[in-house]
Amino acid sequence: MFNLSLHGDPYPQQPGHLQLSWLDRMGERVRLAWMRHKQVNGWVLGRMAKRVLKAQTERESMTPEALREDLQRLTLALRRDGLEDALVEQAFAHVRLTAQRVLGMAHFPVQLKGGYIMLMGYLAEMDTGEGKTLTATLPAATAALAGFTVHVVTVNEYLARRDAQLMTPLYRALGVTTGVVTESMDSDEKQLGYRANVVYCTSKTLVFDYLRDRIQLGERMKPMAMAFDALVGGGRGQVMLQGLQYAIVDEADSIFVDEARTPLIISAPSKDASELAFLHTAWSLSQQLQQGQDYTLSGEEPPRITEAGSAQLAQLCVDLPPVWQGQHRREEAVAQALTAQHSFDRDVHYIIRDDKVMVVDETTGRVMPDRAWERGLQQLIEIKEGVAVTPPKETLAKISFQLFFRRFLRLSGMSGTCREVGGEIAEVYGLGVVRVAPNRPSKRKNLPIALYAWRAQADAAVVQAVRRCHMLGQPVLVGTRSIAASELLSQSFSEAGLPHRVLNAKQDQEENTIIAEAGYKGGITIATNMAGRGTDIKLSKEVQACGGLHVILTERHDNRRVDRQLAGRCARQGDPGSWQEILSLEDELTQKFLPLLGRTLRAWLALMPHFFLARWLGMVYYRWAQSYADRGHRRVRRQLMKTDFQLRQSLSFTGEME
């Protein structure tokens, strides 16, 4: 049972957590496993689903007036007694019956199970296409009826707006208010959106608005201080959120894991005018160093300045101001400039729009116009691209996803690809992962992986595969890793006479139209990660007869879960569909990790393209490179969390806020 008294706390949230010892972490893992087995095992979930269906049957014959009275009685009971199982089952019955009448959709038993798992505070792993948007209405509406503010957190604004628009009629019929909050809204619009019972928003918008509340309130963000402000009629209107009560995180592995590598920072223009000149000098110095002699590059590691490079820099800085005479400071600045030059590429990590450098989210493939890199990296990339340089920023507040989501009174989530990171999610967020079987067996056909030595060979094979499907009338979705790769492949398709659409961060305003047409007969769509998580491509009966949607992956990402999300765009809810990988040993992953081994295997595969051992060893190397990249990101997340804990401990000692 979940019953928290929120009265007297104007901004309810969990207190900050201290880092646990390894023994405490092991104990917590054991406790989570036992609670998961006890609360959400198959027998419990099966009985719950049957009781919900029975409760719905009892209410189907009620008049509208009697049904409203029953819902009012249930609402009062939920607010008085909390989320007791008997009350939850009745609430689920109301939600299912209302969805059936208002939306024309009734929750399947597997969706009832997924909703219950989330309401109990777990992460439900449901296959792509199983209807997670509708499933989320069960815990969201039930918690809202019980008096809690619910945040339904998604990975992008397109999904937040779409899901809210689809489900608002259901919530309205239940007497629950809904709101959508996007980054482009002003403070008044956001405040109004956050006042709703169920709020749809993105993870970044939610975190940044929380940080803005902290900046606004400072040390007054404490129950006693805020209660006093509310008593005297002040303070409450200053904040946007109503606290951190209950969050349902969609695509939870993306938000909890993939996006958790960098902290969320609110900054303001720096008052130090000399900092911009300092960065220009750093860039100028970096251009006078020679790769291989003065600095080295290795995979995803930052550029490393050699002893010769250190001596060269010391010589170049002899006549520069005193700030350049310290070895550590100058080498750190020049290394950052080299990072901007070599590690960040246009149309991969950022785009140029309206003479501005705009960050592209690696995970979602979307432009983040209001985001910027820290520690001068944004300005150095702007210098590199020759666009207007924005003033450097100073940090006002920062927090990591790991620390932020642990502050919710209750946290839950759902995803189709979280089993690989279940241990990390349990350790960091205290969330157990519960697998939910699909409603219908998958009809997806997994075609053999095609591996080529060179990217040009792989692209030619992609063109041939797409042409075959196009002639059969089968729609094709081709996934690429970057904007540049999507545009290069588009050029190959145009030369081959294949009509197609391209969806990447440069065409983000046409997203709805492109997605709507991606399932048309004979349609060809090239897309980055924007067509990954949450994208539902509708198919006609005619297209299903042609074999359904065919998905081609042209390059693997840094973790296998992103690839699986793309595969999940086809064969949804029992529809037919197929999936294929056409890769090369020239792909980005193979360029970063043990490149000498990659070149050797590439030369061997080029000489003997049909030799089984050459292809097999090539795929072993490719999988290893992907695994190595994933482990590297995991190390970064652990280090960020460790730093976050250390910062919090030091600030709590000094009395400052993080």
From Swiss-Prot:
<dbReference type="GO" id="GO:0017038">
    <property type="term" value="P:protein import"/>
</dbReference>
<dbReference type="InterPro" id="IPR020937">
    <property type="entry name" value="SecA_CS"/>
</dbReference>
<dbReference type="InterPro" id="IPR036670">
    <property type="entry name" value="SecA_X-link_sf"/>
</dbReference>
<keyword id="KW-0813">Transport</keyword>
<dbReference type="InterPro" id="IPR014018">
    <property type="entry name" value="SecA_motor_DEAD"/>
</dbReference>
<dbReference type="InterPro" id="IPR011115">
    <property type="entry name" value="SecA_DEAD"/>
</dbReference>
<comment type="function">
    <text>Part of the Sec protein translocase complex. Interacts with the SecYEG preprotein conducting channel. Has a central role in coupling the hydrolysis of ATP to the transfer of proteins into and across the cell membrane, serving both as a receptor for the preprotein-SecB complex and as an ATP-driven molecular motor driving the stepwise translocation of polypeptide chains across the membrane.</text>
</comment>
<dbReference type="GO" id="GO:0005886">
    <property type="term" value="C:plasma membrane"/>
</dbReference>
<dbReference type="InterPro" id="IPR001650">
    <property type="entry name" value="Helicase_C-like"/>
</dbReference>
<comment type="subunit">
    <text>Monomer and homodimer. Part of the essential Sec protein translocation apparatus which comprises SecA, SecYEG and auxiliary proteins SecDF-YajC and YidC.</text>
</comment>
<keyword id="KW-0472">Membrane</keyword>
<dbReference type="GO" id="GO:0006605">
    <property type="term" value="P:protein targeting"/>
</dbReference>
<keyword id="KW-0653">Protein transport</keyword>
<feature type="binding site">
    <location>
        <position position="536"/>
    </location>
    <ligand>
        <name>ATP</name>
    </ligand>
</feature>
<feature type="binding site">
    <location>
        <position position="111"/>
    </location>
    <ligand>
        <name>ATP</name>
    </ligand>
</feature>
<dbReference type="InterPro" id="IPR027417">
    <property type="entry name" value="P-loop_NTPase"/>
</dbReference>
<dbReference type="Pfam" id="PF21090">
    <property type="entry name" value="P-loop_SecA"/>
</dbReference>
<dbReference type="GO" id="GO:0005829">
    <property type="term" value="C:cytosol"/>
</dbReference>
<dbReference type="GO" id="GO:0031522">
    <property type="term" value="C:cell envelope Sec protein transport complex"/>
</dbReference>
<keyword id="KW-0067">ATP-binding</keyword>
<keyword id="KW-0547">Nucleotide-binding</keyword>
<keyword id="KW-0811">Translocation</keyword>
<keyword id="KW-1278">Translocase</keyword>
<keyword id="KW-1003">Cell membrane</keyword>
<dbReference type="InterPro" id="IPR000185">
    <property type="entry name" value="SecA"/>
</dbReference>
<feature type="binding site">
    <location>
        <begin position="129"/>
        <end position="133"/>
    </location>
    <ligand>
        <name>ATP</name>
    </ligand>
</feature>
<keyword id="KW-0963">Cytoplasm</keyword>
<dbReference type="Pfam" id="PF07517">
    <property type="entry name" value="SecA_DEAD"/>
</dbReference>
<dbReference type="InterPro" id="IPR011130">
    <property type="entry name" value="SecA_preprotein_X-link_dom"/>
</dbReference>
<dbReference type="GO" id="GO:0005524">
    <property type="term" value="F:ATP binding"/>
</dbReference>
<dbReference type="GO" id="GO:0043952">
    <property type="term" value="P:protein transport by the Sec complex"/>
</dbReference>
<comment type="similarity">
    <text>Belongs to the SecA family.</text>
</comment>
<keyword id="KW-0997">Cell inner membrane</keyword>
<dbReference type="Pfam" id="PF01043">
    <property type="entry name" value="SecA_PP_bind"/>
</dbReference>
<protein>
    <recommendedName>
        <fullName>Protein translocase subunit SecA 3</fullName>
        <ecNumber>7.4.2.8</ecNumber>
    </recommendedName>
</protein>
<dbReference type="GO" id="GO:0065002">
    <property type="term" value="P:intracellular protein transmembrane transport"/>
</dbReference>
<dbReference type="GO" id="GO:0008564">
    <property type="term" value="F:protein-exporting ATPase activity"/>
</dbReference>
<dbReference type="InterPro" id="IPR014001">
    <property type="entry name" value="Helicase_ATP-bd"/>
</dbReference>
<dbReference type="InterPro" id="IPR044722">
    <property type="entry name" value="SecA_SF2_C"/>
</dbReference>
